[in-house]
Amino acid sequence: IVMTQTPSSKSVPVGDTVTINCQASQSVYSNNRLAWFQQKPGQPPKLLIYKASTLASGVPSRFKGSGSGTQFTLTISDVQCADAATYYCRVASTNNIVFGGGTEVVVKGD
């Protein structure tokens, strides 16, 4: 399976909304396998969303995951400076783990 993530980068002002898309080359057998991560320089990836749409503990409700099948979306509402990072979708199966190529979110006024 190949995960195609778009856009590769996005620059947005504080308070705006960012939408990140992830398209799978084949249907994801179970949404339980789809997750979204946030990574900042020098830090390990942080789990934001699992099971395609479930917020991880401590993650603000401004982050929303949606989608099924081959199309998945991460939406960040009311973007804050702290949201500047690279975001990745990930599909885990019994055999392997596949990440999307990443989306760098740059927050204007950072």
Curated annotation (Swiss-Prot):
Chain residue ranges for the region called Complementarity-determining-2: 51-57
SUPFAM superfamilies, per database record: Immunoglobulin
Pfam assignment, any one: V-set
Domain of life (superkingdom): Eukaryota
Comment field (misc): This chain was obtained from antibody to the polysaccharide of a streptococcal group a variant and was isolated from the serum of a single rabbit.
Location of region: Framework-1: 1-22
Organism of origin: Oryctolagus cuniculus (Rabbit)
PANTHER family reported in the protein's UniProt record: IMMUNOGLOBULIN LIGHT CHAIN
GO biological process, one term: adaptive immune response
Name of the protein in its database record: Ig kappa chain V region K29-213
Any one Gene Ontology cellular component term annotated for this protein: immunoglobulin complex
Location of region: Framework-2: 36-50
Annotated region described as Complementarity-determining-3, given as residue ranges: 90-98
SMART domains: IG (SM00409), IGv (SM00406)
Database matches in PROSITE patterns: IG_LIKE
Keywords, comma-separated and alphabetical: Adaptive immunity, Immunity, Immunoglobulin
Region (Complementarity-determining-1): 23-35
Region (Framework-4): 99-108
Region (Framework-3): 58-89
